[in-house]
Design a protein with these regions (language model features):
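Helix-loop "lid/cap" segments that line or gate small-molecule binding pockets
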Residues: 105-114
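A short, Trp-centered hydrophobic/proline-enriched beta-strand micro-motif
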Residues: 130-138
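Alpha-helical interface subdomain recognition
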Residues: 1-93, 97-99, 114-119, 126-131, ...
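Short Gly/Pro-enriched turn/cap motifs at secondary-structure boundaries
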Residues: 100, 127, 142-145, 169-172, ...
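Short glycine/proline-enriched turns and hinge-like loops at secondary-structure junctions
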Residues: 78-79, 146-148, 172-176, 190-193, ...
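Conserved hydrophobic/aromatic beta-strand scaffold that supports enzyme active sites
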Residues: 135, 149-153, 160, 178-182, ...
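A short core secondary-structure module
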Residues: 159-160, 164-208
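Flexible, small-/acidic-enriched active-site or ligand-binding loops
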Residues: 149-151, 202-233
Length: 393
C-alpha cells in the first residue's frame, strides 16, 4: 500500500492568516509536484535508502528549493513561508526522504549570512537549481548534542585549513556536494574555538562511510563522513574563525522551528489517514468509527492537533518578526515532536494488526516519528531549556 495522498480534513479549511494568496497558489503547485513526483516513488526510495539526484533537479526546476534566498544570491527572493510550505506538503504525504527542508532552511542560511561573495556565487545558485545538494555536519561519535565537545580539527596552513575528523548521522550526507562542517580551529578555547568550513565533494581526503540503516525515515540519506587531512581553502571559512559555535546557536531556533512545522504537518496527515480508515474498516458488524472508544480517541487527537497548529503558526509568526528565542523554539520542538509520537501511536492502535504492517503508511509514520524527539536536541534537553527559563528568572 502506497503512502496516501488524499487530503480532506477540518484543519485544511481553517484560516491561516500567515499566508497570502501567493502562498496559497504556491502551495497548490507544491502539492501537485509532491503527488506526481514524490508520493508514487517514495516506497521505492525507502527500499533504495535514498532519493535520486534528478528529483532534486526537478524540485529546483519547480522553484521548491531555497525560496527565501535573495535574488542577488541567485534565489527567487520570496520569503521563508514558501520554504515552510514545501516542508508542510512533504509532511502531508508522509514523505521523509527528500532532504529539501534541511538544504533550504538550515544549510543555505549559513552560506548566505557568512559566506565570502565568491563562495556564495559558486554554491547558492546551484543549490537553488538542485544541481548541488547541501548538508551540515555537527554530530560526532560520542558527542551527541554537545557541539562544544567536538573533536574534528582544522589546522591553518597558509591559505588552507587541514581538516581531520569524523562525523556521523549526517542527513543528505551521501548525496551532498557541499557540507558545512563544524570543527575546532583552536581546541584549547572550547566552544570559542569552533569554526565552520565548507567542504566540497571533490576535495581529496573527504570520504563517506556507509549509508546508515535506521528504524525509520529509510528514504532519507544518512551518512558517516570522514576527513583525512582535507585541504580546505581559507576562502571556505564561514564568517570569522572561532565564531562557529555562535553562528550555530543563532540558527538553532530556525532549525527547531522547522521540526515543529514538519511534525505538525505529519500529525495532521496521520489523523486524516486514520479517520478515513476507521470509516471503512468493520469489526463486529459495525464500522470502527461507530465505537465510542474510537470516537473519543480521535476527538482528543483532533483537539491536540488543533492546539499544535495554533502554536506552530504562532511560532512561525514570531520567527518572521524576529522574535523567536531559544526558549520558544525549544518549547515548540518539544510539543510538536511529542505530539507526532503520540498521534502515530494512538492511530496505529486503531489500525490494529494492519497498522503493524510496513506497507501501510501508518506503520512507516510510526517508525519515522521516533527520531523527532532525538535530533536537533532531545526532548530532555528541550525541557531543560524551558525549565531554566522558568526557574532562573
Amino acid at each position: 500500500m502506497a503512502r496516501q495522498s488524499g487530503y480532506s480534513a477540518a484543519h485544511e479549511t481553517r484560516p491561516r492568516p500567515l499566508f497570502s494568496p501567493d502562498h496559497h497558489a504556491f502551495r497548490e503547485q507544491v502539492r501537485r509536484f509532491c503527488e506526481r513526483e514524490i508520493a508514487p516513488q517514495h516506497a521505492a526510495w525507502e527500499e533504495a535508502h535514498g532519493v535520486p539526484r534528478d528529483v532534486w533537479r526537478q524540485a529546483g526546476d519547480h522553484g521548491l528549493l531555497c525560496c527565501w534566498l535573495p535574488e542577488a544570491l541567485g534565489g527567487p527572493g520570496a520569503d521563508l513561508l514558501f520554504d515552510f510550505i514545501v516542508s508542510e506538503e512533504l509532511g502531508r504525504i508522509g514523505a521523509t526522504g527528500p532532504g529539501f527542508p534541511l538544504h533550504s532552511i538550515i544549510v543555505a542560511p549559513y552560506l548566505a549570512a557568512h559566506g565570502r561573495p565568491e563562495l556564495q556565487q559558486a554554491l547558492l545558485p546551484a543549490m537553488v537549481r538542485g544541481d548541488k545538494i547541501a548538508a551540515i555536519a555537527m554530530t560526532e561519535p560520542g558527542t551527541g548534542s554537545d557541539v562544544a565537545a567536538i573533536r574534528t580539527q582544522a589546522r591553518r596552513e597558509g591559505e588552507h585549513y587541514v581538516l581531520t575528523g569524523q562525523k556521523t548521522f549526517i542527513t543528505n550526507g551521501h548525496n551532498a556536494d557541499l557540507v558545512v562542517v563544524a570543527c575546532k580551529t583552536d581546541p584549547a578555547q572550547g566552544a570559542h574555538g569552533v569554526s565552520l568550513l565548507v567542504v566540497e565533494r571533490d576535495m581529496p581526503g573527504f570520504t563517506r562511510g556507509r549509508n546508515l540503516r535506521k528504524i525509520g525515515q529509510h528514504a532519507q540519506d544518512t551518512a558517516e563522513l570522514f576527513f583525512d587531512q582535507v585541504r580546505v581553502p581559507a576562502s571556505h571559512l564561514l564568517g570569522d574563525e572561532g565564531q562557529g559555535f555562535k553562528y550555530l546557536m543563532q540558527k538553532l531556533a530556525q532549525e527547531r522551528l522547522l521540526i515543529s512545522v514538519q511534525c505538525q504537518a505529519r500529525a495532521e496527515a496521520v489523523l486524516d489517514w486514520t479517520v478515513a480508515y476507521v470509516q471503512e474498516r468493520r469489526a463486529f458488524r459495525q464500522r470502527l468509527a461507530d465505537f465510542q472508544n474510537t470516537r473519543f480517541k480521535l476527538a482528543q487527537l483532533a483537539a491536540d492537533i488543533a492546539a499544535g497548529r495554533a502554536f506552530c503558526d504562532q511560532l512561525i509568526a514570531q520567527h518572521l518578526a524576529g522574535g523567536l528565542d531559544a526558549v520558544g523554539a525549544a518549547a515548540g520542538k518539544l510539543w510538536h515532536s511529542e505530539l507526532l509520537g503520540r498521534v502515530t501511536d494512538e492511530c496505529l492502535q486503531l489500525f490494529g494488526g494492519y497498522g503493524y504492517m510496513a506497507e501501510y503508511p501508518i506503520a512507516r509514520a510510526y517508525a519515522d516519528a521516533r527520531i523527532e524527539r532525538i535530533y536537533a536536541g532531545t526532548s530532555e534537553i528541550m525541557k531543560e531549556i524551558v525549565a531554566r527559563d522558568l526557574l532562573d528568572r
